[in-house]
C-alpha cells in the first residue's frame, strides 16, 4: 500500500512543479484511533497565490459503500482531497482535511464530486466554515497499475452552515453558480457566505 501512496505523492508533486511550485511540500501527519495515518501536504508558491493542502492516505484502500453486500478490495474507487486557501495556514485546517480523508475508512463514506462532507464544527480556529463541498480539481487522476482503479483528487471547498443547507436543498451546482453571481472567491478564508436567491 505504501507504493500506492508513493505514486500518488509523486504525481501530485509533479502537478505542482508544472505549475511553478517547485519546493518540497511541508507535511503534517494526523492519526485517528483505529485508522491509518493521514498526511496533509502543503504546497505554497510565491506571492499571493492560493496554498494547496493535499491529503495522502485516503487512497491507500479503495472506498467501499457500507450498503454493498460484497466489496471489491481491488477495483473500488480511490480518492484524495485538496483544499486551496489564500493567506497564512490556519491552525486546525490540516486536521479537518485529514478527517475528510479518513472518513471512507472510519465511517464508510464514499468521496465523490458534489458530495457534502459536514464536520459540524469550525474547519479551523475561528472559521465560519463547518463543511466541505467536494468537486473535481485540476489535478489529474493518478493512474495505478492494473487492476487498481485510478486515484481521483477532489477539490474540497470550505462552506458555511447556511451554504451547506443550500447545497442540501438545491444541489452543488446551484451553490457554485451562486458563488459566481455573488463574486465569491472560494479560496478566500475571510470571504462572506454566498446569499443565493
Located regions from the model:
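Acidic, proline/glycine-rich low-complexity IDRs
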Residues: 1-197
Amino acid at each position: 500500500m505504501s507504493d500506492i501512496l508513493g505514486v500518488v505523492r509523486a504525481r501530485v508533486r509533479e502537478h505542482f512543479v508544472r505549475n511553478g511550485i517547485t519546493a518540497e511540500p511541508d507535511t503534517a501527519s494526523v492519526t485517528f484511533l483505529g485508522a491509518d495515518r493521514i498526511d496533509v501536504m502543503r504546497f505554497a508558491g510565491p506571492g499571493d497565490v492560493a496554498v494547496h493542502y493535499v491529503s495522502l492516505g485516503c487512497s491507500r484502500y479503495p472506498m467501499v459503500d457500507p450498503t454493498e453486500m460484497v466489496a471489491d478490495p481491488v477495483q473500488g474507487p480511490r480518492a484524495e482531497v485538496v483544499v486551496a486557501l489564500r493567506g497564512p495556514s490556519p491552525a486546525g485546517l490540516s486536521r479537518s482535511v485529514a478527517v475528510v480523508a479518513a472518513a471512507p475508512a472510519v465511517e464508510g463514506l464514499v468521496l465523490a464530486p458534489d458530495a457534502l462532507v459536514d464536520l459540524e464544527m469550525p474547519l479551523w480556529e475561528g472559521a465560519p466554515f463547518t463543511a466541505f463541498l467536494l468537486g473535481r480539481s485540476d489535478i489529474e487522476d493518478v493512474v495505478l497499475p492494473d487492476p487498481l482503479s485510478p486515484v481521483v483528487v477532489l477539490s474540497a471547498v470550505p462552506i458555511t452552515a447556511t451554504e451547506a443547507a443550500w447545497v442540501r436543498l438545491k444541489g452543488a451546482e446551484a451553490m457554485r453558480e451562486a458563488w459566481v453571481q455573488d463574486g465569491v472567491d472560494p479560496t478566500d478564508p475571510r470571504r462572506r457566505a454566498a446569499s443565493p436567491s
